[in-house]
Amino acid sequence: IDRSRGLGDVYKRQPSKDLLKDIEIIVFDLQDVGVRFYTYISTLHYVMEACAENNIALIVLDRPNPNGFYVDGPVLENSFKSFVGMHPVPIVHGLTIGEYATMINGQKWLNNGNICSLKVVTCLNYNHSIRYSLPIPPSPNLPNMMSVYLYPSLCFFEGTDISVGRGTDFPFQVFGSPNLKEGKFKFTPISKFGAKNPKHKGVLCVGNDLRNINIDSLN
């Protein structure tokens, strides 16, 4: 709990009835990056679930999607549903957080087909054909636009022995492992804000640095 504000933690969990007992409206304002396993949309689902079950109105403040100019990747199979993938959508889904909330309602993905009382405050003058550069990093491990663009691809390495640079100044812009024998780049992950115990902490990793690639050549 945030003791200074009395706000509860809803990460990886649905808000409890006790937490919501004096609440009439919830305002959801998070910067998503348009990727299925970036878990802000899972948190959104849990919040919508709780709002639907407790007759609480939800206001979503929409934001541009920095990866909203394309759609890519396979659709999730329901048998693999988890907190890092809750819905049958592509890896890069192309929607803003407000559009995604509307889809959750429209597809009746909430428990028992419940519908959340939802109001989306839309973005003015935004369209998906224009790339949007984020003015503020959405999280400590996505510190710049290169990391945001590479995240949909490099995140798959997190299920392997490969480090994606957590615990460095360039997460999701490099990759490597102590077990790789060849590579043009070396780095050693350390404990940092947002990466207290990164993979291969304190161990030299060999791999590649992607910070200077032409991101357009990957699409």
Task: Give the label of every model feature segment.
Residues 1-11:
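Single conserved hydrophobic/aromatic residue that forms the stacking wall/gate
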Residues 4, 20-21:
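A short, aliphatic-rich alpha-helical micro-motif
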Residues 81-154:
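Conserved anion/nucleotide-ligand pocket segment
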Residues 59-81:
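Glycine-rich, charge-decorated loop segments at or immediately adjacent to ligand/cofactor-binding or catalytic sites
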Residues 32-44:
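Glycine/threonine-rich flexible loop motifs
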Residues 53-57:
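A short helix->loop->beta-strand "cap" motif at the edges of active sites that frequently abuts
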